[in-house]
Amino acid sequence: MPVSRYAVFGHPVAHSLSPAIHADFGKQTGIVLDYTAIDAPPEDFSAALQRFADGGGKGANVTLPLKEAACALASSLSDRARLAGAVNTLVRHEGQWQGENTDGIGLVRDLTDRHGLDLRGRRVLLLGAGGAARGVAPALLQAGITEMVVVNRSPERADALCDTLGEPGRVVSRYIEDLRDLGDFELIVNATAAGRDRDAGAFAMPLGLVNSLTAAVDLNYGATAIAFLAWARSAQCRYAIDGLGMLVEQAAESFALWHGVRPDTDPVYAALRAREAVLVSAD
């Protein structure tokens, strides 16, 4: 029986933990698969995805900076992917790619199941308005948050995300310059790559954003998350959480879409957490 082919596409992608995660899921469930990392610059992504499909590819994950391009290339989209305008999971079906987004449910599962947070009634500050932010925003709204404030260096992108989400009384955009006047939040989510250069000053944000319940969450993990989590700890956030748990949970959702079984994420997460020092950045 031929081995089923899967991959993660990104640029860069050599750092990705997805091949190791899916290999562990395969061993756990007894499913034999070939999962590789494929580096595809944005201008070559469409052709690379077609070559993968022509070679028997059955499913793919998509990481930065290709999630919005994957949305455009998919022949059909789930409601979550359509609302997000970004795709992180592709399923091959009858010669076509179906687009899904498991980022949001991965984040919510990590926060609620692993960290025990109750998101209902919470006020959320979302930093960023690109593919990562678009992937998690709908799921946070569905989890019962009260208000989401979107802040992005490009205000037009923040406005566009708010328009896409379509809840004007609940989701608003604000300028970075307004951070000092926004009040405090129970959840602050960094969906930017601002920490990639490891600049400690990248998150020089006002301490007034934080209250006694605040959880600060970076969708990145490893070195890219250091600057934001350092700010979170200096601001005395109750929780400072990186994106490793979200990565494992969204991978499990993708695995379930492809194989019809959801693996146990706890042992995989524990093994990766033990290797935390070698982690680089988020999928």
UniProtKB/Swiss-Prot annotation:
Question: What are its GO cellular component terms?
Answer: cytosol
Q: Which InterPro entries does the UniProt entry name for this protein?
A: Aminoacid_DH-like_N_sf, NAD(P)-bd_dom_sf, SDH_C, Shikimate_DH, Shikimate_DH-bd_N, Shikimate_DH_fam, Shikm_DH/Glu-tRNA_Rdtase
Instruction: Provide the residue positions that the database annotates as binding shikimate.
Output: 16-18, 63, 88, 103
Work out whether the entry's keyword set contains Oxidoreductase: yes
Quote the EC number: 1.1.1.25
Indicate whether Nucleus appears among the record's keywords: no
Molecular function terms from GO: NADP binding; shikimate 3-dehydrogenase (NADP+) activity
Tell me the residue numbers annotated for binding NADP(+): 79, 128-132, 223, 243
Q: How does it assemble?
A: Homodimer.
List the protein's name: Shikimate dehydrogenase (NADP(+))
Q: Say which species the protein is native to.
A: Xanthomonas oryzae pv. oryzae (strain MAFF 311018)
Gene name?
aroE
